[in-house]
C-alpha cells in the first residue's frame, strides 16, 4: 500500500467534524462485543494499488483467523484530506466502521476530533504487542502519539534521505557523501557536481534539487537540521518566522543563486532529471526506487547533511481503531496483524519489484539489503530512525490542506526571487497564524 509522503494532505472540515465527533462518541463501545467476529475497514481508494493492498491484508487476516469476516469500504477522495472528510461523513450518517487507514500527518486530525480509540491499554496488557513493539523503532511509535495517546501501530513508513547518482559522482571524480557530512560539505559537493557543458551560462547538470510541490521532501529536512520546525511542539502555533526556518530557507535560496540548484520542480520532474544525469542529488523517501528499478540502478542514498543538529524527517501510515467500532478487541487483532511478519514482508519487495515503503519491523527492514534490493546502502533507511533523533511532532495541524498550500505558495515566491526570504517567511507566518490553531 502507498504510504509515501508525497500525497499525504489533509482537510479541516470543521463544521462536519463537530457532528462526526458527537456521532463517534455516541457510538463508542467501551468493551469488546461478544460473538460478533466481523470488521469493517475504510481506506482511501486512490487506485488499484490501494484496493489490492488492502484486500491482500484482509484476506490474509481472515485466513489466519477462522470465522472472521472483514468488509472493506473504499472511500473516494482527491487526496488524504478529502478522504478524511468523507470518512467523517460516513460516520456522521450512522455507519460504524472499526478501523480506518490514516497517514502520520492525520494523527492530529483524528485525535483532535475524538475519532479514534488510543491503544495504550492494549500495549500495556498484550504480551504479543510487547514483542512487536520491541522490533519497532521508538520514533515510529512517537510519530503516532498525541498528548500521550498512542493512536496506532505503523505498518509502513518513509524517511527523508539524499539520493545521489553514483555514475555522475564517478564521472565528476567526487567521493560519495559520508553520513556525518555538513551543510558546508554538501554545498561544496553540489558545486563540484554542477556543470555547464556548452558554456551558455546555464548549468546542464545541477548538483541538487528538491520538490516544489511537497513540504517533507522539500524544506523540512533542512528546517529540522537547523533545529527548527514549522509548528510548535503542541502543533498549535505556526513557527515559520523563527531564525531556524529562516536559516534553512536561506541556505536553499543561496543554492539557487549560486546556480548549483535550479528552481524547485515537481517530484516527477526530479525523478526524470535524476535518471538522465541532469541532477546529481535530490531528497525523498524509499518510494522513488519503485520508479527507478529495475532499469535504473545508478543510485545510492545517504543521510541529509548535519546543520546545527541532525533529525530524521519521516512519516508513515496505520490502521487506528475508531471509537465507532462495535468490536474494538478484534480491531486490535487486525491492527497487530498489519505489522506481522507475513504482511511486513510485502514492503521489502525484490530487486525487480521493490516495495515503495519501509517495513516498520526492524527485523524485516534488515532483509532489504539481504535480498539484494537496491540501493547498496539500504540499511540506512531503518538506521535513520533507529539510530538518530527524529522530528516529532509532524508539522501537520488539523487544517493541513490549507497549511500545506500556504507554505508551498510562499516558498514558490521566495525561490522564484519574487520575495526575499525574510519577507516571504513573514508573510507566510502571518497567514499561518490563523490556520495553525488548537
PLM features per residue range, with description:
Residues 145-155, 160, 170, 184-237, ...:
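Extracytoplasmic/periplasmic solute-binding protein
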Residues 124, 288-296, 308-314, 321-406, ...:
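C-terminal lobe and pocket-closing loops
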